[in-house]
């Protein structure tokens, strides 16, 4: 039997960002591929002391794992929501019983949060243990892209166990295609708009115009060329988006993607790229991002070094050039809405 680990969310505070959307879509796609849920239920361990929480999560995971038999396959979304210091040992135990264990990576925290000065040392140690020990023993790992694969190889994970996803899928109930797109429409920015992640929004050049969707935006600091539309639930957001391109950019500078979040784009596939493409919009990405390779290969967007170059780059596109980008974005978007990329990656797991 093929299973996926179904970890229950304890809180719903992230309902209006894409954090839950990516995991929920993975679960829906693998269900369609015949995977069964393996339920991991936990009490609110946030209210427990560290040791008690670790023991509680380990006991719950062991109980879930006890249902698996030789020949079964288990897919785990990474990082785990209810990871404990005992997880690696428990995974090894079921592997010795003949269970194959695979991971699909959403984030590598060692490349992101663990580099922040504000992250406690115990959290950095946990990240190191989880990412170094747990992924190393996997029977297969789905990474975002070839660049992330190379980082994992440097961490000691055998290359033959690694599969590249290429881009995240994004399911849209009741999808409606958008018509009449033009290169002169505003640039779309969706997602977490808070200062620490999207500080560049307060430093944009006067043109082009930008349409903003998400949480954390300081409207009192909005620029003249910015229009803020508020936040939406992930499944409602695609219908609300209006513009000519979707922007994938992070950090505190419009000159380049900078800081912890900006540098992270060198390695990861931002989920908002999938949102834009699934919604039918071509992308604007940072030229040094991992995603730029996919975008340029598929012809579904443009890549720039700086947002100060964006207006000129768009102006230099002919209407026919832009329509080609739109057509390619819609073609890739159809694949993304169908779950094509995860389905393909699952077939390549050893």
For the regions a protein language model found, what residue spans apply to each?
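Conserved catalytic-core segment of nucleotide-activated headgroup transferases in glycan assembly
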Residues: 23, 170-242
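Nucleotide-sugar-dependent
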Residues: 238-279, 285-293
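A charged, aromatic-enriched C-terminal amphipathic alpha-helix characteristic of glycosyltransferases
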Residues: 179-180, 305-312, 318-350
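Active-site proximal beta-strand in glycosyltransferases
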Residues: 73-75, 94-114
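N-terminal subdomain of nucleotide-sugar transferases
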Residues: 1-43, 202-208
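Short N-terminal targeting/anchoring amphipathic segment
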Residues: 53, 64-86, 99-102
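A short, active-site helix/loop in glycosyltransferases that binds the activated sugar's phosphate group
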Residues: 113, 136-162
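Membrane-proximal helix-turn-helix segments that form the acceptor-binding/catalytic region
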Residues: 90-100, 120-141
């Amino acid at each position: 039997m093929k299973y996926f680990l179904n970890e229950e969310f304890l809180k719903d505070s992230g309902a209006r960002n894409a954090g839950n959307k990516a995991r929920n879509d993975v679960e829906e796609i693998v269900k369609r591929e015949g995977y069964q849920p393996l339920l991991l239920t936990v009490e609110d361990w946030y209210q427990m002391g560290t040791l008690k929480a670790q023991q509680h999560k380990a006991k719950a995971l062991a109980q879930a794992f006890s249902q698996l038999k030789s020949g079964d396959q288990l897919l785990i979304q990474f990082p785990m929501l209810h990871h404990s210091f005992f997880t690696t040992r428990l995974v090894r135990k079921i592997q010795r019983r003949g269970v194959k264990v695979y991971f699909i990576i959403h984030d590598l925290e060692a490349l992101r949060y663990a580099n922040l000065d504000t992250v406690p040392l115990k959290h950095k140690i946990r990240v190191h243990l989880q990412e170094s020990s747990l992924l190393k023993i996997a029977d297969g790992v789905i990474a975002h892209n070839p660049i992330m694969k190379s980082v994992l190889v440097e961490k000691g994970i055998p290359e033959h166990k690694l599969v590249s996803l290429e881009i995240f899928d994004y399911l849209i109930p009741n999808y409606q295609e958008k018509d009449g797109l033009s290169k002169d429409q505003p640039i779309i920015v969706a997602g977490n708009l808070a200062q620490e992640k999207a500080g560049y929004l307060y430093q944009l050049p006067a043109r082009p115009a930008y349409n903003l969707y998400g949480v954390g935006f300081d409207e009192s600091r909005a620029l003249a060329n910015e229009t803020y539309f508020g936040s939406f639930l992930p499944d409602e957001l695609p219908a609300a988006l209006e513009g000519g391109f979707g922007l994938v950019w992070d950090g505190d500078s419009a000159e380049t993607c900078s800081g912890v979040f900006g540098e992270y784009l060198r390695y990861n596939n931002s989920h908002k790229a999938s949102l834009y493409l699934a919604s039918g919009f071509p992308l604007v990405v940072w030229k040094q991002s991992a995603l730029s390779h996919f975008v340029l290969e598929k012809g579904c967007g443009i890549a720039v070094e700086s947002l100060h170059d964006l207006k000129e780059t768009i102006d230099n596109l002919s209407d026919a050039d832009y329509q080609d980008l739109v057509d390619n974005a819609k073609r890739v978007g159809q694949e993304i809405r169908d779950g094509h990329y995860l389905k393909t990656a699952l077939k390549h797991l050893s």
